Structures are given as structure tokens and as C-alpha cells.
Regions:
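Short secondary-structure transition/capping segments
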Residues: 131-132, 171
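A conserved active-site-flanking secondary-structure segment within enzyme catalytic domains
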Residues: 135-161
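Aromatic-residue-lined binding/catalytic grooves and analogous aromatic/hydrophobic interfacial grooves
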Residues: 122
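Structural detector of well-ordered beta-strand residues that form the stable sheet scaffold
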Residues: 118-119, 140, 159, 171
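Conserved anion/nucleotide-ligand pocket segment
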Residues: 166-173
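Extended, subdomain-level signal for the structured scaffold at the beginning of enzyme domains
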Residues: 1-118, 126-130, 158-160
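Residues that mark the start of a beta-strand
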Residues: 14-16, 138, 169
């Protein structure tokens, strides 16, 4: 049986919010923000948002907790819709092997050139920092990993004891 790929329906007047997922993404880092952005279509007074996932494959991504997610787009092969907001959730290897993925880091750099906002949740800040897009702004990460963040990226303006930092188009939490 041949399966037909189902792409998400993207309303042209909405913001496009892409979630960068990889094996080991933590469920709540992805699903809770996805839900919040997706539900903007039910709110009055704010611009609605299209939500979709991007990964380096179209094969299922397995979260740290074992949930399998079919990515909407493969950023290594697909023509992607314009991405207004990139969300980088924390993943199991955000502080180590994911930082060696040059294709992913270059994807982040490329999206940063035109995105309205670049966001991370917890250790998702590490790939943003590795892409050098946080070099001139303040940022933060998961509280128990602040010292690792400071050690790995000593040139950054890192804030601790805060829930989030919003500096220009960059939002880290």
C-alpha cells in the first residue's frame, strides 16, 4: 500500500511556526508550546498561527519518552514554507551530539536570517548558541544547566535566576 504524504494546511494570513524536532525531543518541550501556538486560531485579537514540525527526515522521530512523531517537513530536502517563528525544544542531546550536527546548525542560521522570532525552550538554547545567533543578545536556559551553558558559551550574555529572556527577536526560557 502506497501512502500519500499529508502536508499541513497553512493559512496564508497566519504566522508560520515551525518546531524543530529530533530524536530525543522531550514531550512537554514540544507538545505544550505546540498546543499554545496552534490554539491561537481560536483567540480574538491576535494573529493566528499555523504550526508544523521540521526535522532532518520524514521518518518518525522518537521523543525521549518514546512518542513517535511524523515530521511535516524534512529541512534537508523539502521546499519549506516561510518560517516566521522557529521553536527549538529541548532534547536529550541538546548539550552534546546535537551540537555536532552541522546541517541542523546551518538550518538554524538560515532561518534566523528571515524569521520574526527565534525561540528555545530550556536546553534548546544550546543549538541556538552554537549557531552563533545569540552572540549579541541576552539569553538563558534550563536552570540546572546554566553553568554548562556559561562554560560552553563564555562569550554570551547569560541571565540566570529568570524564567525567560526576550531580547529583540530572540526568546529563550
Amino acid at each position: 500500500v502506497k501512502e500519500t504524504r499529508q502536508l499541513p494546511k497553512l493559512e496564508p494570513s497566519n504566522y508560520n511556526v515551525a518546531f524543530l524536532i529530533m530524536n530525543g525531543t522531550f514531550n512537554t518541550e514540544f507538545t505544550a508550546p505546540f498546543d499554545i501556538f496552534q490554539h491561537t486560531k481560536f483567540r480574538k485579537g491576535i494573529k493566528a498561527m499555523n504550526t508544523f514540525t521540521v526535522a532532518n527526515t520524514l521518518e518518525p522521530i522518537t521523543t525521549f519518552e518514546g512518542v513517535r512523531i511524523l515530521p511535516d517537513f524534512d529541512y534537508t530536502k523539502d521546499d519549506l514554507p516561510k518560517i516566521d517563528i522557529l521553536v527549538v525544544p529541548s532534547a536529550e542531546h541538546s548539550m552534546d551530539s546535537d551540537l555536532k550536527d552541522e546541517v541542523m546548525i546551518n538550518f538554524i542560521k538560515q532561518i534566523d536570517k528571515s524569521a520574526l522570532y527565534m525561540t528555545s525552550h530550556c536546553d534548546g538554547a544550546f543549538p541556538l548558541a552554537k549557531a552563533c545567533i545569540l552572540d549579541s543578545v541576552a539569553s538563558t536556559t534550563f536552570p540546572s544547566d546554566i553553568e554548562n551553558y556559561k562554560a560552553m558559551f563564555p562569550n554570551l550574555d547569560i541571565k540566570d535566576n529568570v524564567l525567560f529572556v526576550h531580547d529583540g527577536k530572540y526568546i529563550t526560557s
